């Protein structure tokens, strides 16, 4: 069996593909797996590091806006896309994949389109509640479309072959709350807030938490991943405390989730999948510049079930934002109800189920 994954640019598009590949090779150890990507995406370094073959294609994303510079840039990008489509066709002829799996990102479109034009079986895995342009356009001819949110179904112009399978996410070893809090050097029996904004951090969230830190640690613990860009600035402004762990990156994310009672973070698809799989209540702050405002749609999917609360990025400076977080942190009954609602949205075996669907599609 030969499977070609096309997706990347960011970890949110790449790692679901990697998770599927891992499960696929467990089920079919002799399978041939390779990835298509771009030289500027995260896949350029990650895929070789993980030991998979990588095929690089020259493709760029469209520039947004109506300025002359954006229009001229897009003309060049469309010319590049035509070349990428031809290269993708050549790649598919050489690799002869049984199934092509698209997970989003700039490279996904030409590879999926070329595969569809050549009559190959294709599977689209969409991470967000508001599907990207590639998913909406190419889902019409895809063999199967797998969504992470049921809310995304309304944007797909077909019913047959559409499944809500969840988003493949990192798996964690979860410890007891007590052991996890001990790992971070926190005070036992106090509620714990976990804050993160990705490996690079989230400046607006960090600035808000910096203002709230005394109020938070007065009666609670704080585990705070600042991201690499903000760490030095913030570390210099906070006092050491037995109720605070702060670092640029959390290596043991399983312990972070195990120790926490409430999570505050962005609403990217990977974070949402981790929250649902661990059943953690959250305060979500959608990244306001995400394409199509898709993080807001992701957040609203959880808010609508009672699993989370949403604070606009522009409202983080308001006193009400701090009060929302503090009130939740000290309301164990509400946190329990939110966590239960969040857990009901979980798809912990998403990667395995998707791998099984790929195997089924690959059969003659």
UniProtKB/Swiss-Prot annotation:
First-listed, main subcellular location of the protein, grouped into a coarse class? membrane
* Catalytic activity reported: di-trans,octa-cis-undecaprenyl diphospho-N-acetyl-alpha-D-muramoyl-L-alanyl-D-glutamyl-meso-2,6-diaminopimeloyl-D-alanyl-D-alanine + UDP-N-acetyl-alpha-D-glucosamine = di-trans,octa-cis-undecaprenyl diphospho-[N-acetyl-alpha-D-glucosaminyl-(1->4)]-N-acetyl-alpha-D-muramoyl-L-alanyl-D-glutamyl-meso-2,6-diaminopimeloyl-D-alanyl-D-alanine + UDP + H(+)
Give one Pfam family, short name only: Glyco_transf_28
Q: Which residues cross the membrane?
A: none
Any one GO biological process? peptidoglycan biosynthetic process
PANTHER family, per database record: GLYCOSYLTRANSFERASE (PTHR21015:SF22), UDP-N-ACETYLGLUCOSAMINE--N-ACETYLMURAMYL-(PENTAPEPTIDE) PYROPHOSPHORYL-UNDECAPRENOL N-ACETYLGLUCOSAMINE TRANSFERASE 1 (PTHR21015)
Protein's job: Cell wall formation. Catalyzes the transfer of a GlcNAc subunit on undecaprenyl-pyrophosphoryl-MurNAc-pentapeptide (lipid intermediate I) to form undecaprenyl-pyrophosphoryl-MurNAc-(pentapeptide)GlcNAc (lipid intermediate II).
Write the protein's name.
UDP-N-acetylglucosamine--N-acetylmuramyl-(pentapeptide) pyrophosphoryl-undecaprenol N-acetylglucosamine transferase
Q: Which gene encodes it?
A: murG
